């Protein structure tokens, strides 16, 4: 893989786009059958669910995302003033198509092909992504109707309070947050995947084999296919409009799609219960039970929709209320505890942001973003007060490799 390193401290783990082969794109999307997506579509296709893709922007002219799949969003950082509907890099478009691709004429089909994509660009024309831009993008998405926030990115920078606040803002507004563990094959998971309550997604290959380049750690929650994933990209990136990629970015998008299916199947269900369904119905992908490599296992959208799973009042991955400084296990088999450097973190105060499939850059137009209207689901009880951490110097998000 080609490595790209820019000045800064946040990484985007990406892979080189490869033109798809002559056979139909759908036939190359092995991950859909591996996850049982066709069966899941008999019960839910994601209709009415808004998934925010905080990334490089989303090309709303891509055939598999045209016709209303993508609504105008917003841009932050160097993409400020845009609607997020242009993507000169392809990463955001690829993630959006994995989530909600319409599969036009045998093209890229998403896990939730009737969901709506809300694009949030956090950088333009290859400029550096800042933690501030990512945090602002998350907050904006939550305030503009997102049911699920997809963060196919990770950081190796020092944790910033604004990023932590943004993710907690999502939790407080009943939004499911999904993030990748990273693609360096190391035993370290950066932010935002290491924030307690986030669905931290590692990668698998065919036959439930763990993907060797996934970052691992006690924060890992779920896994999904991450090797040889075919999705749509802008034709300005690959002239066929499709590419094959590796990375936990793709795995993250697939889990976001699964979350959208559950939210559509149970429109009154709170985010905590959606998370609970996804983790309790996952298929063991490594050793029996939860482990640091694939978490609770590979996501199973069909089981998550159809299994008899009790609703819960609070996110089973979140910190339990406590009256002392000692850690208290959360209420429903959370990711195994490690020493905390901050009350809301399970992996120390290191943060990092990696996009796991294609490099994130954006070109956009200056239009005001559309405010999505929807009826909010009942909000889960608020989490206990969170102690703030000292603000570090502003860190920049690097693109480390394709």
Positions of predicted regions on the chain:
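Secretory targeting and sorting signals
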Residues: 1-23, 355-372
């Amino acid at each position: 893989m080609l490595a790209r390193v820019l000045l800064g401290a946040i990484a985007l783990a990406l892979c080189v786009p490869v033109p798809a082969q002559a056979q139909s794109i759908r036939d190359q999307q092995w991950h859909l059958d591996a996850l049982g997506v066709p069966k899941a579509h008999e019960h839910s296709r994601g209709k009415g669910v808004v998934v925010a893709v905080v990334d490089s922007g989303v090309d709303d002219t891509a055939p598999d995302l045209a016709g209303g799949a993508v609504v105008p969003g917003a841009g932050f950082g160097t993409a400020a003033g845009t609607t997020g509907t242009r993507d000169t890099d392809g990463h955001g478009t690829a993630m959006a198509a994995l989530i909600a691709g319409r599969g036009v004429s045998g093209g890229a089909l998403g896990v939730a092909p009737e969901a709506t994509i809300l694009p949030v660009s956090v950088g333009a024309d290859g400029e550096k992504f800042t933690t501030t831009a990512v945090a602002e993008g998350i907050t904006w998405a939550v305030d503009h109707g997102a049911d699920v926030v997809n963060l196919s990115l990770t950081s190796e920078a020092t944790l910033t309070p604004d990023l932590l606040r943004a993710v907690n803002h999502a939790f407080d507004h009943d939004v499911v947050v999904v993030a990748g563990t990273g693609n360096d094959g190391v035993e370290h998971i950066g932010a935002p995947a290491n924030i307690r309550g986030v669905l931290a997604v590692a990668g698998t290959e065919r036959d439930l084999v763990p993907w060797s380049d996934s970052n691992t750690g006690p924060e890992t929650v779920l896994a999904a296919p991450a090797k040889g994933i075919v999705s749509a990209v802008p034709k300005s990136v690959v002239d066929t409009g499709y590419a094959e990629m590796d990375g936990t970015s793709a795995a993250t998008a697939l889990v976001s799609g699964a979350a959208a299916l559950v939210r559509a199947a149970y429109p009154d269900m709170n985010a905590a219960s959606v998370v609970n369904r996804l983790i309790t119905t996952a298929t063991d992908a490594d050793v029996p039970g939860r482990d640091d490599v694939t978490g609770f296992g590979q996501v199973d959208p069909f089981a998550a929709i159809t299994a008899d799973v009790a609703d819960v009042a609070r996110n089973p991955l979140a910190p339990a209320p406590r009256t002392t400084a000692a850690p208290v296990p959360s209420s429903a088999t959370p990711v195994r505890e490690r020493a905390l450097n901050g009350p809301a973190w399970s992996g120390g105060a290191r943060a990092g942001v990696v996009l796991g499939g294609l490099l994130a850059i954006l070109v956009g137009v200056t239009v005001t973003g559309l405010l999505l209207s929807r009826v909010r689901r009942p909000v889960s009880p608020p989490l206990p007060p969170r102690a703030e951490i000292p603000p570090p110097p502003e860190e920049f998000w690097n693109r480390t490799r394709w």
